[in-house]
Amino acid sequence: MLRIGLLAAILCSSAYAAEPSPFDEAFQALYNFQFQASHQAMDRYIAAHPQEPLPYAVRASVYLFYELDRLGILESEFLIDDKRIARRERPPQPDLRIRTQFIKALDDAQSRAEVMLKSDPNDKAALFALCIAQGVTTDYMAFVEKHQFRSLSPAERSNSYAQRLLRLDPGYYDAYLTAGLSEYLVGSLPFFIRWFVHFDNVNGNKEKGVRNLETVARDGHYLKPFGKILLGIVDLREKKYREAQKLLAGLTHDYPENPLFRKELGKLNAKLGDSGN
């Protein structure tokens, strides 16, 4: 499963600014699969705010999504088939240039967030940046490098940062994405693997995980669309095709430049015998 996101652009005292920010621009472009435009928005912000960790976490997220799209890993047939996710006979070959830039962005986010946490252990922006950095590390290791078991370590760390953030601010809705995904992920693991992993404040309750994702899809800001994407994947995995169709129709309307949303909606309409009109 995938996950991605960020805090507001205007200092961390207000997570959800009313005025569109460079981060709004970056995420709008990301959800439209306009990766270069998303990078450009973050490049401009970093030029003015080089010591903030948040834009580097977004930059890493854009690199991740570029690779997932390039390798066809975001196709529904892949994401709903655990055997295809785990298959290792012909692992996808990562773009080494992108991988280098991805790791650099992660290091930049991590180092800056750690400096902020030394000054204030409860800094929400730093915690969220680390949550995102560990989350995209998880996805890269699991989906691109095919190291599913090893990817559980950064997944645990990402969840730990999300749980710390939610204890500080239960209304920090974007953080529920990682918390919800962790619940669903642990609940989907085989028992013998669950025995060896521990996620902070996570019991493997898949229903609770879905409720957390619904919270993001309803009340989130930057990750609101991603909450809908993950709910759509859950619905497809659980054969709730009408619910998935509604989510995909909304995403296609909101992000018309995203070819994957249109393609997946078309496949689902055909499966259900709908015209899609």
Predicted regions and their residues:
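Short, solvent-exposed loop/edge-beta patches enriched in aromatic
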Residues: 47-54
